[in-house]
Structure formats: structure tokens, C-alpha cells
Amino acid sequence: MPERLGIVSYANVAPLHYRLEPWGDEIEFVYGVPSELNRMLLAGEIDLTLISSIEFLRWRDRLTALPDFSIATLGPVYSVMLFHWRPVDELDGARIAVTTESATSVQLLRVLLEGRGINAELVPVAPDLESMLREHDAALLIGDKALVEAVNRRTVDGRQPLVSDLGEAWYRQTRLPFTFAVWASLKDNPPSRTLVGKLREAREHGLGVLHEVACHESPIRSVSVPVMQRYLSNFRYYFELPDRDGLIEFGRRSIPDFDPEELRYWPQ
């Protein structure tokens, strides 16, 4: 029976699985947005996936992560973006439409607002910028939609919203990277050494041909090759010590009585 691997259907994950499919029938690929794959992993419907960092933190009693994989940035992320009609410091009491695709980005926004003493109502809605901004004071988008909207800077009803990058905002508050996702599995279902080895090989290959990956992803995501290459080269894929420190800080700001010693990682 093949191992079921959850693949987030966003461009920033492409370097981790580029050319992975040709390696045979040992792996079944399951594509989805983070919220879908999070649910499937916890239900035992997939074996290993990139899981949103907040879900890894919340479900630390059930999950174990690979020790050397992450989706993280030090500073701007370019694809977790808040579009807003007035400056962020004036959003106290605002209604902010938030994407339903990722719990981590919504929690990150909540943490950042609280860090600035801002109390806003976060309203989960379908991720469509125009409808979000017509009915709310601000809108949180993630992934390829956020990247495209931030690049194009189109108007909504004749007005152009302000744009804030949450990765950059996190760095300004903490001086740490932000880890958006880690590879994780259920504690009682470790991934095979073969699968982990293939993932490491795929990452090395993808990062080694990053321009090729950017050329492949560019037309799919409707952005130029230079924009896509800059975007992909910005990510930290190895879950180094600063990325772990950022994850722990996020846990401390998000979860009461959080103890980082409860986080578990598979052997290297």
C-alpha cells in the first residue's frame, strides 16, 4: 500500500516536490489547501503532510514532525497579506475578513494585532478579495491569491487598498523567522525512511533548479518568472534553529501554558 503524502497546492511548496512524481508507485499524492490536509492527517486519511504550524502546536500530543523541513521566512513572505482600507494602527474595532484556507495565517494576524493593542473581529469568509473588501474593513489572503493580488495591486470599486506583509510584521515584532508549516505525521504512524529520503532528494533537486521550478510555476500562478523566482528563493526550507525559535515564540503567543518541550520530532 503506498504512503499517502499530502501536498499543499501552493507555489511555495513546489521546490519540495518538483519531479517527485516520477519516482514510482510507492507514494500516493493528495493535494489540497492547508486546512483540508490538516484535517485529513488528524483523521488518519493521509500519512505525512505539510501541516500548518498552529495545528502542529495545538495537536502536539498527537503529531511528530520531521526535524529538517519547514516553510519559513525571515521577513517578508509575499503571500500572507493583509489588504486594508486604513492604516493598521487604526483597525481597532474593525471587521477583518480572513481566509478559510489556513488557520496559521489567521492566528498570526491575531497575534500581530494583539501585539499592537488592536482588537478586531476576524470573520472567516471565502477568499475573494473584492467581496471581502466590499463588506469588511480589511481582508487576509494567503498563498497564490495573495501573491497575485499583491503584485497586481488592483483597485476595488475604484480604490486601491493598503497592503501589509504579515511575515515582515512578525519579524519587526520579534526579530525571528516565522515558520508557516512543517512536515508531520501521527505519532503512531512514522513515515518510512524511504519516503523521507525521497523528500530530501526532491528538495535538493528542486532548490538546485530553482529557475526551472520558477519557469514551471510562473504561468500556472499568473506571475512573471522573475517575481516567482524571487518569491521561491525567499523561503527557508530546512527548519534551522532560528526557524524553531520562531515556531516556539509563536506557540508562546498563541497557546496558554505552552511548553516547547512537548514538541516531538522524528530522528534525523
Where is each model-derived feature located?
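Secondary-structure end/capping motifs
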Residues: 189-253
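Pocket-lining segment of extracytoplasmic ligand-binding domains
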Residues: 124-216
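Hydrophobic/proline-rich hinge and linker segments of small-molecule sensing/allosteric domains
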Residues: 69-88, 172-188
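Alpha-to-beta junction loops
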Residues: 26, 42-51, 118, 134-141
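Beta->alpha turn/N-cap motifs
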Residues: 10-13, 33-34, 45-62, 67-69, ...
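Bilobed "Venus flytrap"/periplasmic-binding protein-like clamshell domains
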Residues: 1-22, 32, 78-132, 136, ...
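Long, low-complexity C-terminal extensions of enzymes
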Residues: 244, 251-268
